Curated annotation (Swiss-Prot):
Located at the top of the head of the 30S subunit, it contacts several helices of the 16S rRNA. In the 70S ribosome it contacts the 23S rRNA (bridge B1a) and protein L5 of the 50S subunit (bridge B1b), connecting the 2 subunits; these bridges are implicated in subunit movement. Contacts the tRNAs in the A and P-sites. It comes from the Bacteria. Belongs to the universal ribosomal protein uS13 family. This is Small ribosomal subunit protein uS13. One of its GO terms (molecular function) is rRNA binding. GO terms for biological process: translation. Part of the 30S ribosomal subunit. Forms a loose heterodimer with protein S19. Forms two bridges to the 50S subunit in the 70S ribosome. Pfam families: Ribosomal_S13 (PF00416). Keywords: Ribonucleoprotein, Ribosomal protein, RNA-binding, rRNA-binding, tRNA-binding. GO terms for cellular component: cytosol; small ribosomal subunit. Residues 91-118 are annotated as: Disordered.
Amino acid sequence: MARIAGINIPDHKHTVIALTSIFGIGKTRSQSICASTGIAEHVKISELSEEQIEQLREAVAKFTVEGDLRREVTLSIKRLMDLGTYRGLRHRRGLPVRGQRTKTNARTRKGPRKPIKK
């Protein structure tokens, strides 16, 4: 297994799909990484040479991924909550942040139904 950005990349998958197992790299960014390094998208990770894997490591290192990205997202949410913005309050209360309705639906964000006590 190749190790890129601290993640074990699955050998049996194609390069484009395998790179998406890194947090912060989706399909589009994965395709652009393959294009910039000159590695074909349909080649499996196990078929790549050590030099090509090193090229992928360098290309991925240019982006904010994994732990740094998770930390950045967490800190930005915490900043919103500390400032007391509307979005921060919605995060704090565990409600939908982006304007979705909450009279019905929003069960994923609100959690399971709570019975009405008589």
